[in-house]
Amino acid sequence: MRPPAPFVPEEHQLQPGYAMVVVGFGSPEEHAAVLDQARSAVPPLVDFASPMPYVELQKMLDEANAWGFFCYDKGCYVEELSDGLIDALVERFPQKTSPLSIVLFYRLDGAYSEPAEDATAFSGGRSPRYGTFIIGVCPAPEMLPAERAWVTSIADALRPYATQDEPLT
């Protein structure tokens, strides 16, 4: 859900949307090139990009993950965001009951792909891919069964698109 915040146009507040967080450790020019490519592919409704200390990046989502929430999650790796995968998400995403629940895609590429597949403690292959996280987050325990069903429904729908190596959960 887009927040009811001053930087979001009023007609788009509290409507489904997406956010893209781009993290890079290369040069400012490399980062700008990635942002330019993303902006041209999917023009943003709201755009904010700024260098920040890594610790600030880590704290950026703390408020949305406060202590006391009830959560259930599943995940997998997918190699591409195919039309079938997107259709599965579009069909099931509106079925969530909690506005806090989310589906995240982390692009794993670049330095992630450099070590040999058995060279680190992080399991799974090292080929470029997306780590996919389906997270049901509820402020009250009575909401959790419905969110658990939502998470499981999406995980089951994404299974045909998942890689065959070790799943995240």
Where does each model-flagged region fall?
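Soluble FAD-dependent oxygen oxidases
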Residues: 1-169
